[in-house]
């Protein structure tokens, strides 16, 4: 049996990194939970003397025939002055009848129009499509939705009310829900993950630090802000996260508005999930490479802190989990011996219980999600679903650092037989 001091040191260092992040996560959980309690009693309304501004709703679409009609139905059903809305579907070279569906619905509702991306500019990803749409839009307020979204009627109204009533805000971000969450085990895990992210990371960071990350859909932003920061980065696979940093550097903020809800499809196949999550991870690699070198110069300071947290979460924590898992397996098989002194088994048990407690309480903020079955899934996710992220991060690092593969936008597979919420 092999043993050495460096193995013990490696194990202790991994435990220290994990517990530092667990402590910070616990703080975000508490502040996020308190924010969820406060926001439950707040109905977003316009400040006195203000009027509802005209909004351009932009929807990038590439081969979205399965879902685009339902999305347009929901966008047209917004509880918002009808004469203050234009809906632009950015058709990025669709070959499945998406354009024909949009044209048919546009003939019935004058607010809808299709913007065809020129062939020589097509297939360059969401950022490029949105840039074309902004240039073609006419209103000062921009709202972004993905082509599979089913926003609730009051969603746009909530986003706009908070944004217009607070001059310090550059954008407002709503909440997304998983429309196909009951389809299979994977979508149930994704549903739990999404709720935990929003009520812990989004709500917690907003309440504690005044920070929120643009999620890529269900958000409203001022046109002049987009112009000031130079629009979307066309090289970014996670254009929302990259844009968030540049917005905060202007001194403005982005607010999480949980009353603004949209329902979206999530991957139903593990293969689709890996493709999507790898794109996210590679997108974050790009963001880190672009902005991490300016870490000490970033303003406000909380922005630098948040980027550092993201770096630790993606790399240090994943490395610590991988190392601790590996040492645990090697020690359990008798190949190595660890002699680090400390109540590590009790610490691990406490970390596990905190995970279950935090996510379980978070689920209680959503109607119908705090079931015993979901609590069992939370326990299972700790040992299964959460560990899949290790593979995603390693795969993304291999693609970017070792193999240096070209970053290409990978469209997420859609499913047509999902009922509206």
Regions found by a protein language model. Give the residues of each.
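Long helical/loop segments within the catalytic core of UDP-sugar-dependent glycosyltransferases
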Residues: 106, 110-140, 153-237, 278-289
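Catalytic donor-sugar/metal-binding loop of nucleotide-sugar-dependent glycosyltransferases
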Residues: 244-262
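Acidic donor-binding loop at a coil-to-helix junction in glycosyltransferase catalytic cores
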Residues: 237-243
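N-terminal signal-anchor transmembrane helix
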Residues: 28-84
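A conserved acidic beta->alpha catalytic loop
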Residues: 82, 91-100, 119-121
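Cell-envelope/extracellular polymer assembly enzymes that use nucleotide-activated donors
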Residues: 53-56, 86, 227, 242
